[in-house]
């Protein structure tokens, strides 16, 4: 095995190339690889944080949904109670109005009956006077006997 100058020169070039690569090329490559590794790690951490945030958000949404559902249910129950109360109040008011109308109608009927009785008394008194007039064949003075007619009305 001959060791000649070419091999030494190639070895020298190889070591110079190795030193140059280690000194000037390798550090930016390792730096780029480390930065890329760090970006990947940051991305994975952000993804994990995003997953955790998503889980928390879903939990909050579930709580908000449950709260809204219970609140809606409570509002529906309250609205139903209020509607029932309003219906009951309207029913009471309608009953009171009906009672008032019936009482007014009864009062009007009683007044009409009273008026009819008064008119009937007047008619009966007039007929009695005419009958007495015809029986006696003379005219009876109505003014003179007004008190007698009023007593007759009171008795009827």
From Swiss-Prot:
Kindly state which keywords UniProt assigns to this record, in alphabetical order: ATP synthesis, Cell inner membrane, Cell membrane, CF(0), Hydrogen ion transport, Ion transport, Membrane, Transmembrane, Transmembrane helix, Transport
Instruction: Tell me how this protein sits in the membrane.
Output: Single-pass membrane protein
Instruction: Enumerate the subcellular locations listed in this protein's record, separating them with semicolons.
Output: Cell inner membrane
Coiled-coil features, chain-numbered ranges: none
The molecular function GO annotations come to: proton-transporting ATP synthase activity, rotational mechanism; proton-transporting ATPase activity, rotational mechanism
One Pfam family, please name it: ATP-synt_B
The portions of this protein that span the membrane are 7-27
PANTHER family tied to this protein: ATP SYNTHASE SUBUNIT B, ATP SYNTHASE SUBUNIT B', CHLOROPLASTIC
The record's note on quaternary structure and interaction partners says:
F-type ATPases have 2 components, F(1) - the catalytic core - and F(0) - the membrane proton channel. F(1) has five subunits: alpha(3), beta(3), gamma(1), delta(1), epsilon(1). F(0) has three main subunits: a(1), b(2) and c(10-14). The alpha and beta chains form an alternating ring which encloses part of the gamma chain. F(1) is attached to F(0) by a central stalk formed by the gamma and epsilon chains, while a peripheral stalk is formed by the delta and b chains.
Q: What is this protein called?
A: ATP synthase subunit b
């Amino acid at each position: 095995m001959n060791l000649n100058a070419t091999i030494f020169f190639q070895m020298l070039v190889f070591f110079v190339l190795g030193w140059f690569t280690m000194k000037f090329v390798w550090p930016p490559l390792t730096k780029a690889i480390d930065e890329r590794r760090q970006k990947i790690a940051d991305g994975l951490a952000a993804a994990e944080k995003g997953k955790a945030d998503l889980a928390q958000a879903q939990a909050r949404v579930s709580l908000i949904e449950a709260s809204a559902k219970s609140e809606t249910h409570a509002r529906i129950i309250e609205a139903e109670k209020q509607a029932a109360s309003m219906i009951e109040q309207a029913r009471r008011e309608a009953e009171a109005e009906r009672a008032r109308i019936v009482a007014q109608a009864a009062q009007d009927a009683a007044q009409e009956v009273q008026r009819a009785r008064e008119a009937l008394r007047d008619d009966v008194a007039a007929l009695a006077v005419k009958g007495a007039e015809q029986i006696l064949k003379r005219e009876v003075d109505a003014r003179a006997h007004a008190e007698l007619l009023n007593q007759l009305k009171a008795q009827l």
